[in-house]
Amino acid sequence: MNIQDAQPSTLREMIKQGKLTGHTSGMAKGYVQANVVILPSKCAYDFLLFCFRNPKTCPLLDVSEKGNKSFTKYGVTADISTEVAAYRIYQYGELIETRANVDDLYTDDMVSFLIGCSFTFEHALLEAGIPIRHLEENHNVPMYVTNIPANPSGQFKGNITVSMRPMTMTQAIKATEITTRFKNVHGTPIHIGNPTEIGITDLALPDFGEPVTINENEVPVFWGCGVTPQSVALDAKPDLMITHAPGHMFITDIPDSQLSD
């Protein structure tokens, strides 16, 4: 089966059965992918505000009802506790485990958030002739924690995380124009060029994901990243926070075109 052209529900079922375990970049071409955050209800309001205050890094797509494992729009038949290829479990700000299923942790008190992912606009970039290096090299996209502070909300505070894609400056200008249409999945780049200006000292050592080749005629282009809540969790220290593992997204039933202005 060609996973690029597979239906989201088919891929989610394969993930649930343990038949798909890798990063999801390039899967279900033309459909929205989302970052995942699952929290106890007592933390939900502060995190909701955190998303609204930081739309470039945490563009909110959907929120579940308390205790509900599905979503009203982005996954009506989904089970958020079993249909993400890899989950991370944080307790009091410490990453304690990565696993394939969190059904036993999902209580009636949990609230789930879906946050826009830049994988969603990659298809539009490819159609415009802009290379996606991590796809070419079969890597997870490189992600870096910056020195740019997020706008805090309650216990949620810290610096934002970005994803990086190298390209020529001409392509970067075109990519900026294209991603202007995708405000619900991070929109335009946060930074283009010198990574030290945003606190990144070595592009070969990403905080999440894998490094990619950057050619001499290329510049790094940085977009806001929905992994930001995971770096923020180190400061927020909620009793329990469940997220997707970086690059292992929730594949929704919604076409990319519905998020393009």
Curated annotation (Swiss-Prot):
InterPro entries from the UniProt entry: D-Glu_cyclase, Putative_hydro-lyase, UPF0317
UniProtKB keywords: Lyase
Record-listed E.C. numbers: 4.2.1.-
GO molecular function annotation: lyase activity
One Pfam family per UniProt: D-Glu_cyclase
Keyword Membrane applies: no
PANTHER family, sorted: D-GLUTAMATE CYCLASE, MITOCHONDRIAL
Family: Belongs to the D-glutamate cyclase family.
Protein name, per record: Putative hydro-lyase SSP0308
